[in-house]
Amino acid sequence: MSKNKKWLIVAISLILVGCITFTFVMARLDWDFLKLGTSKYRTQTYDITETFSDISIENNTADILFVLANDGKCRVVCYDNEKIEYQTGVSNGKLNIKPIDNRKWFEHIGINFESSRITIYLPEKELGNLFVKNSTGDIKLEKLSINSADFSVSTGKIFASDITCAGDFKTKVSTGEVFLLSTKCKNLISSGNTGDITLKNVIAQEEFSIRRSTGDIEFEACDSNNIFIKTDTGDVEGSLLSSKVFIAKTDTGSIEVPKTTTGGKCEIITDTGDIEIDIKQ
């Protein structure tokens, strides 16, 4: 038997042993991959008894969810690494939430299949100003009336549905995506690099201002008095509810916009991306 065949037999044998060992271990764990994680997680609940209108959250990896409380009591429920605590409290009418990471540097190294999350249970659906700064975690809120929103993420997603915002609704992403559904606001202001933005049934009283580098911009049945959209290589595609005076510019992409001459201004600028807009009747 040649030397190469011997090495091949050894390699195949090791692979088979590895597969058998993996199958045995996972069977003992009921095929629950979460049990392979090297970090321990726990749930921490913080009852908020003081009244507030504004919320400020600074976080890194945890998903952030805003939920209406069934019992009318406000609380913050955090599911995270057991060595991460959360500083919560109300100051000057603002609920502040911030993580305190007690891990040493080497404790950041390991296998982890868990997802951290912060759930804010709200006693009522009317709030003041929301400020959330996140990194890889998502931000999700539904069925709320707020004064203003200022959300920023790096790679996480921003999802908002059935929101009434009296003031500005701001989002900022790096590679993360933005999804806004059935939302009304005074101004929609969104900036980002490669992250896409998708809007459906979003109405801004005054202006849309959307900027992206390579991210695509899509909207359906949306409208605003004035619209400004700027992207470098991303495409712009969507439908509006009313006529606009269109100013569309692209270097190498194609342009398809209605030839309407009434309504507010809709300016769309892209370098290599395509522009395709229509008016939904």
Model-derived features with residue positions:
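Structural signature of tandem-repeat unit edges
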Residues: 180, 199, 219-220
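Acidic (E/D-rich), amphipathic helical modules within compact regulatory domains
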Residues: 195
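Acidic (Asp/Glu) and glycine-rich low-complexity loops/linkers
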Residues: 2-134, 140-153, 159-173, 179-191, ...
